[in-house]
């Protein structure tokens, strides 16, 4: 079978406008995919040059063998209907190894058409490394690479204001652009690059903070041959993802003319405040996971899709969102309802096998960040406890209860006589290992009194200790499914 190539998917030569640190599945099915659509539907007329952000491993040979073409396949549910959309992406024009060919990489700093820098270097990528050195080609860290690249660009264009760059980090950390800018400014001072450069960073460059949301499942191992047959060509860079996508870009400047993604029908929001959108994602999408997964696992399920096909569990999850979470959020209700509806469809995606136990990683800190604000907001607004969020605390506790510490820092628990293993902060695992012989009521009071776990004394929320303790006792006495049927059965 013929390999995907430029003859199969011809495209005009476009100027490189985007330098992208990272060539992984997410960026290819998200940013590069959107730029490809912008090239088709607007006058953006730009291409992407990929930069390998670390020394190890690369997909670059595969890119070159396919003339920088690859296929994105979006699969999932849209408005309750199964969809499968394929697109050959032609927006990538080059792939540069900054370690093996630094001169080629550095030439991009002198390219007049360059306007954007995109990065996905993982959460650990945006960290200040004070041992990094300007003399390295390239510097070790991503902030180091970016600082040196921007300095060389400023020097090449004599600090022209119109040759600054727009920085678009998509790393999954809060205020990623603010954090990246702090690192760059710190290195500029440490490396004594001068006040002129520091001023150019402030006036000519734009550091945006972004929020991204799309589940990218990557290369479909085990399905690739069948998909190639359907496509009619071989694609070793095939990338799969869900149809849902969201890119919220917080910027001090209006970027919609230079990067006209919303005008192309793409799910991109430009704003001067991304926090309400972050809150929506954390409270609804992530909060739904964290609130229902412990109970679903204890009902005998192993993946999200199977749990969502249980009417009792899916109805309970939806009531959590619509009745208890959404009333505590500030965005327009219609936006929140639509987002919650999309979340339900995403959880039912038949192409995604999301293991419940993987979601249970660090459940206590996740509950604090994702569910506790909704619970406290609901109590403040109504003066009552939210039934489903309150029960989620009891189901979380019962997931951990009775566990024994293993030698490798996990908690071994039992479900129907079979072991399962939980990973969490050592203090959390020690707490449950040491208190599981206590009565449910005593353990609950101690758990909810632990400010280190919650950053607050949840035991002072009226009725919370009593309600969680009573539910925990019921779960231990009757089993999760029986108790959920009694409380929330449909």
PLM feature spans:
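Substrate/ligand-engaging "lid" and interaction regions
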Residues: 1-490
């Amino acid at each position: 079978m013929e390999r995907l190539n430029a003859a199969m998917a011809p495209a005009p030569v476009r100027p490189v406008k985007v330098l992208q640190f990272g060539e992984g599945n997410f960026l290819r099915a998200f940013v590069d995919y959107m730029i490809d659509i912008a090239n088709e539907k607007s006058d953006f007329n730009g291409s992407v040059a990929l930069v390998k952000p670390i020394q190890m491993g690369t997909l670059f040979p595969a890119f070159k063998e396919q003339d920088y073409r690859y296929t994105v396949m979006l699969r999932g549910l849209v408005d309750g209907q199964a969809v499968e959309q394929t697109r050959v992406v032609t927006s990538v024009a080059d792939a540069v190894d900054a370690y093996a060919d630094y001169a080629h990489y550095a030439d991009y700093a002198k390219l007049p058409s360059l306007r954007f820098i995109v990065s996905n270097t993982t959460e650990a990528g945006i960290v200040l490394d004070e041992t990094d050195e300007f003399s390295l080609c390239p510097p070790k860290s991503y902030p180091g690479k970016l600082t040196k690249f921007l300095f060389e660009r400023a020097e090449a264009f004599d600090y022209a204001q119109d040759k600054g760059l727009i920085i678009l980090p998509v790393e999954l950390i809060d205020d990623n652009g603010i954090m990246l800018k702090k690192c760059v400014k710190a290195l500029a001072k440490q490396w004594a690059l001068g006040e002129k450069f520091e001023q150019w960073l402030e006036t000519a460059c734009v550091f945006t903070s972004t929020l991204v949301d799309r589940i990218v499942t990557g290369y479909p191992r085990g399905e690739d041959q069948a998909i190639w047959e359907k496509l009619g060509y071989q694609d070793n860079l095939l990338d799969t993802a869900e149809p849902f996508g969201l890119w919220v870009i917080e910027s001090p400047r209006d970027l919609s003319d230079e990067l006209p993604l919303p005008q192309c029908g793409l799910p991109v929001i430009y704003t001067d405040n991304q926090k309400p959108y972050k809150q929506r994602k954390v409270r609804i999408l992530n909060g739904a996971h964290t609130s229902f997964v412990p109970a679903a696992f204890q009902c005998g399920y192993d993946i999200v899709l199977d749990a969502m096909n249980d009417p009792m569990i899916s109805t309970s999850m939806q009531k959590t969102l619509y009745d208890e979470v959404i009333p505590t959020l500030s965005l327009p209700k219609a936006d929140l309802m639509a987002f919650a509806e999309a979340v339900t469809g995403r959880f039912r995606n038949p192409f995604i096998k999301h293991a419940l136990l993987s979601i249970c990683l660090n459940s206590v800190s996740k509950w604090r960040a994702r569910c506790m604000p909704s619970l406290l907001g609901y109590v403040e607004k109504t003066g009552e406890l939210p039934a489903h969020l309150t029960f989620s605390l009891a189901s979380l506790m019962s997931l951990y209860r009775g566990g024994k510490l293993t030698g490798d820092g996990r908690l071994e628990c039992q479900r129907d006589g079979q072991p399962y293993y939980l990973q969490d902060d050592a203090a959390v695992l020690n707490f449950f290992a040491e208190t599981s012989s206590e009565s449910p009521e005593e353990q609950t009071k101690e758990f909810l009194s632990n400010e280190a776990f919650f950053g607050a004394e949840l035991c002072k929320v009226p009725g919370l200790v009593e309600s969680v303790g009573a539910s925990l006792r019921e779960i231990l006495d009757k089993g999760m499914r029986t108790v959920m049927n009694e409380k929330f059965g449909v």
